[in-house]
Structure formats: C-alpha cells, structure tokens
C-alpha cells in the first residue's frame, strides 16, 4: 500500500452556490458543488491577511441526492474523498483537464452548523453517513441513562454497608453478655469465700463455751467441808 501511495482529501468549508444535480442514463445522481476554504494569518507588518481557495467537488449516488436536497449556498460541510483529474473538451473542441474532489461510496459527507434554512439541513445529517452524526447524540443519551442508575446502585451499596456494621455490633453485644455472665460467676465465688471467712471469727465464741474455765465444782466442795465440820464427825464409826 505504501508503494502505491495514498490519495485522500479532507475539506471543511462552505458552499459557494447551490448544488447542481443531474442524473445519468443509468439513474444514478451526480452533484457538483464548489466549496470555499479560508485561512488567515498576519504578515510581517502585523496586518491580518486572508486567502480563500475554491474546490470543485463531485458527489455520486445517494450522497449526491442528499446534497441536492439539503445543502444550499453557505452551508458548512465536512467532505472526505479523493483527487481525480478528468479530461474533457470545450465548445471549441479543445481538450481541457480538471482536477476535482470525487466523493463516491468510499467517501463521506457531513453537514456542519446551520443557517436560517438549517432546519432543512439538520435532517441531512441523519440521512446517509450523517446518520452516524445524529446517532452520536443518541448514544450520548443512553450514556446518560446508564449514569442515572449508577447513583441508584450507590445507595444499594450503602444499604449493605450498615448491615455489616450492625452485625459487628452484635458480636460485641455477645461479648459483653459473656462478660456479664462471667461477672456473676466471679461474684458468687467471692461470696462463699467471704462466708467461709466469716465463721472463722466465730471460732473464739466456740472456745468460750468449750473452755472449762467455769469450774464451780470446787465450790460445792468448799460448802461440803463446813458441813463435815458440823455433823459428819459424829456419825463416822471410826
């Protein structure tokens, strides 16, 4: 392909006059238009300069029909085709050569901008290849619709987010409940130890009655001895 070269032309400009459309014997349409492209620059003196180039463009087939129906003088268009030079004869019979931009089925044409009659030109964009131009906003519209459900999925994500938090709150509640159960076990165990320690001080009270310190028994003996002195000596046979 590189050895054969590339023949491709892209133009963005405005029509200099209304399209001329004619039909060939086989019924195919042919449209001739002239497109102006302008460029501006500043010269060495700083003055603004502008230059306009005129391009002859020939369209074939369906594109030619759409061009004649929707394009008018002043319409801004995007054209993509190839350069082609043809030979023809003038009225005097002399050969003439013309280099034109040919746009056939392999090329493309799109309308840019609009005029007062742009309402007619707008549908043109959607008829042939420009249908891709109108389909672009249609693709943008579903893109917005796809973005609208995205916020709706956030809340759904947010919705499950509190659920794991609530589940996390439940395990600590069980831990606190386990701690509360552990506390009652510790407290009753501490109480029996204190209860066991309480009877130990009661042991001295038990020693008080057990102690035979109360020996009143010798007292009757003392009372008994005076009785012996009083009368028991006489009764003793010895």
UniProtKB/Swiss-Prot annotation:
The SSB domain covers 6-110
Segment Disordered: which positions?
A: 103-238
Residue numbers of motif Important for interaction with partner proteins? 233-238
What transmembrane ranges does the database entry give?
none
Which terms are listed as keywords in the entry? DNA damage, DNA recombination, DNA repair, DNA replication, DNA-binding
Q: Does the keyword Protein biosynthesis apply?
A: no
Listed InterPro entries: NA-bd_OB-fold, Primosome_PriB/ssb, ssDNA-bd
Task: Offer an example of a GO molecular function term for this protein.
Answer: single-stranded DNA binding
Q: DNA-binding region spans which residues? A: 54-60
Q: Any one cellular component term from GO for this entry? A: nucleoid
A GO biological-process term: DNA repair
Q: Where is the composition biased (Acidic residues)?
A: 227-238
Bias category Polar residues: which stretches?
105-115
Low complexity bias locations: 125-160, 170-222
Q: Pfam families from the xrefs?
A: SSB
How does it associate, per the subunit comment? Homotetramer.
User: What the protein does?
Assistant: Plays an important role in DNA replication, recombination and repair. Binds to ssDNA and to an array of partner proteins to recruit them to their sites of action during DNA metabolism.
- Classification via HAMAP family: SSB (MF_00984)
Q: What is this protein called?
A: Single-stranded DNA-binding protein
Where does this protein come from, organism-wise? Answer: Shewanella oneidensis (strain ATCC 700550 / JCM 31522 / CIP 106686 / LMG 19005 / NCIMB 14063 / MR-1)
